[in-house]
Structure formats: structure tokens, C-alpha cells
UniProtKB/Swiss-Prot annotation:
This is 1D-myo-inositol 2-acetamido-2-deoxy-alpha-D-glucopyranoside deacetylase. Binds 1 zinc ion per subunit. It is an enzyme of class 3 (hydrolase). It comes from Segniliparus rotundus (strain ATCC BAA-972 / CDC 1076 / CIP 108378 / DSM 44985 / JCM 13578). Residues 289-317 are annotated as: Disordered. GO terms for molecular function: N-acetylglucosaminylinositol deacetylase activity; zinc ion binding. It comes from the Bacteria. The keyword Transmembrane does not apply. PANTHER family: 1D-MYO-INOSITOL 2-ACETAMIDO-2-DEOXY-ALPHA-D-GLUCOPYRANOSIDE DEACETYLASE, N-ACETYLGLUCOSAMINYL-PHOSPHATIDYLINOSITOL DE-N-ACETYLASE-RELATED. Catalyzes the deacetylation of 1D-myo-inositol 2-acetamido-2-deoxy-alpha-D-glucopyranoside (GlcNAc-Ins) in the mycothiol biosynthesis pathway. Keywords: Hydrolase, Metal-binding, Zinc.
């Protein structure tokens, strides 16, 4: 296939469910529009808190079988995000499922020998670069440098992807394919105005017993001017909610309110748009590449128009 036959997008996240929470609507829209959509997940999410009482024995401090269960949940979620025309979202695991383990939320270094944040960074970055060369994506999407609400695996995954994009473009490591330069790199995020508006709208509704409205600062929203790309997912919000429900050990979905909650029971809105931050990519000489990792406190140039699609400017109809 010619590299320009159809658009390809690779989403890279730390745990199962990150993809749906942060960009599920965009993944569904891209798949429906005919793009080849792939997901690279770095861990099985073994340290997640199980909210379903009948499944709590799967937890890490009990039977420690949650990772395998979440593989099936993720497969179901991706099926629900896939196109009605039968397009599938391809699943990849960083060096194979279970190679690295969820590091958990607790502060301090996870002492598990396979903890994601304790792994060999070079080995992990090369594994991610191998997937990039296999998929040959025009667009890569991952966590922001602060990891959203600060999860250490999210922060680590951001660093990993930045390095992997550079490795994939270099004239090295021919054992895992020809070099590939990613055209656009995005971080996930949400603008402050849209986030607070969504919470205000949800707050006008009757919140189910046992839940509370999420606090506005939990998502660590971005200043509006930092957001470069706003994708309309109105037609795909139902698919996103269905995919969220597939992650049943981690998420409770309230379809009638277009909202969900994690183990904290904080009801969180699912807006009809998803936001991203475009990261400048500059590749110089083969042996002297440079990726400009945008300062999270900076903002796009004043003359940069806000995008409405991840494929903007790439020449795809």
C-alpha cells in the first residue's frame, strides 16, 4: 500500500480505559471516516481499583487477575468504538501484553520487577518505536506531560512516546523496519471553559444517589488558548459511552446523563467534543533530530487557527 492511500492514527496510552476516557469519540469518528486506527497500550492496568463487587477478588491485593480481565474489557471497548461498516481498531501492547505492569497510583517507586515506571526506558522506547514503524501512523496521540490528573504512568508514557517518535524516524534499528516520520503529534487535554461549562450543565441534572458531581479541578483543564484542536464527537458520543461501559471493573456509566464515574463515585460529563494540543515536530539531520516538546505553559502562535480534525493539513479528503 502506498503510504498516502489512507490516513493512519496511533493512540498510545498507559492503561486500558485511558483511550476511551481521553479520546474514544475521536477514535470512533476516525474509524467511521475510513482511517486506520490503532491503539498501543503500555500496561494491563493491573493495579486498578475494582468497583464491581462480584469481581473484587480479581484485584492486585487479592487474586491479582485483573490484568487478564481488562484485556477482554479493552477488546470489547474497541469493538464498540469501531465503525458500523466493520472497520476494526487494531490493538497493540508494548512489547506484548503484560511485559510491563501498572505502577499504581501510590507515591514512591513501585518495587514490582515489571513496574512500568521502573522499566528500562531505552528498551521501552524502542518497543514503542517498533510499533510506530509497523503502523506507520501519520498522527500519534498520547497523554500530556502532566499525565492529566498526575498519574505517574501517564507522565512516563508521554516521555516514552516523545522518545519513540524520534527513534522511529532515525536511520537506526533497521531490525524493526524502515524509518518513519510521524507527521503530527498530539497530547490529550480539555480547555477550561468547555470543561466548566460541561460540569455546570451536568450539575443542573438530578445526580443519582450514591454519586456526586466531579470537582471542576480534577481533570486539570488547560487554558483555552493552549487547545489547538477541537474535534466534534456528537455523532459518536453514544459509542464512547458504550465503550466506557465495557470497562466495567473501572467505570460506571450513566447513559441518560452522558456521564461516567470511576471508583471515587464522582460523576464526570462526557462532552460532545474532545480537545487536543498539537506538539511542534522538527526533524533535522538523521543524526541530529530534535522534537520540540512544547512547554505546557506556552500557547500556540497567534496566527495559528484552531483545528477541527486531527488530520487537518495532511492532504486527506
Amino acid at each position: 500500500m502506498n503510504d498516502n492511500d489512507s490516513p493512519r492514527a496511533l493512540f498510545v496510552f498507559a492503561h486500558p480505559d485511558d483511550e476511551t476516557i481521553l479520546s474514544g469519540g475521536t477514535m470512533a469518528r476516525l474509524a467511521a471516516e475510513g482511517a486506520h486506527v490503532s491503539l498501543l497500550t503500555c500496561t494491563l492496568g493491573e493495579e486498578g481499583e475494582v468497583i464491581a463487587p462480584e469481581l473484587r477478588e480479581l484485584a492486585a491485593d487479592r487474586a491479582d487477575q485483573l490484568g487478564g480481565w481488562r484485556i477482554a474489557e479493552l477488546r470489547s471497548a474497541l469493538d464498540r468504538l469501531g465503525s458500523p461498516r466493520g472497520a476494526r481498531i487494531s490493538q497493540h501492547w508494548l512489547a506484548g501484553p503484560g511485559r510491563w505492569r501498572d505502577s499504581g497510583m501510590a507515591a514512591g517507586r513501585n518495587t514490582h520487577p515489571r513496574a512500568f515506571i521502573g522499566g528500562d526506558f531505552g528498551e521501552q522506547a524502542r518497543a514503542a518505536a517498533k510499533t510506530i514503524r509497523e503502523v506507520r501512523p501519520h498522527v500519534v496521540v498520547t497523554h500530556d506531560p502532566e499525565g492529566g490528573y498526575g498519574h505517574r504512568d501517564h507522565i512516563y508514557a508521554n516521555r516514552l512516546v516523545v522518545e519513540a517518535v524520534k527513534i522511529a524516524a532515525a536511520e537506526t534499528h533497521s531490525e524493526f523496519g524502515a524509518p518513519w516520520q510521524v507527521k503530527k503529534l498530539y497530547w490529550t487535554g480539555i480547555g477550561e471553559s468547555a470543561w466548566r461549562r460541561a460540569i455546570k450543565e451536568l450539575g443542573r441534572r438530578a445526580i443519582p444517589d450514591g454519586f456526586e458531581l466531579v470537582h471542576a479541578d480534577v481533570a486539570k483543564p488547560r487554558r483555552d488558548e493552549e487547545i489547538t484542536t477541537v474535534v466534534d464527537i456528537g455523532d459518536y458520543r453514544a459509542a464512547k459511552l458504550a465503550a466506557l461501559a465495557a470497562h466495567a471493573t473501572q467505570i460506571t456509566v450513566c447513559h441518560e446523563l452522558a456521564a461516567f464515574a470511576l471508583s471515587n463515585k464522582a460523576l464526570t460529563p462526557v462532552p460532545a467534543e474532545e480537545h487536543f494540543l498539537l506538539v511542534p515536530l522538527r526533524f533535522g539531520a538523521v543524526d541530529n533530530q530534535d522534537l520540540d516538546n512544547r512547554n505546557p505553559n506556552s500557547q500556540p502562535p497567534a496566527d495559528q487557527a484552531r483545528e477541527d480534525h486531527l488530520l487537518t493539513g495532511l492532504g486527506f479528503a
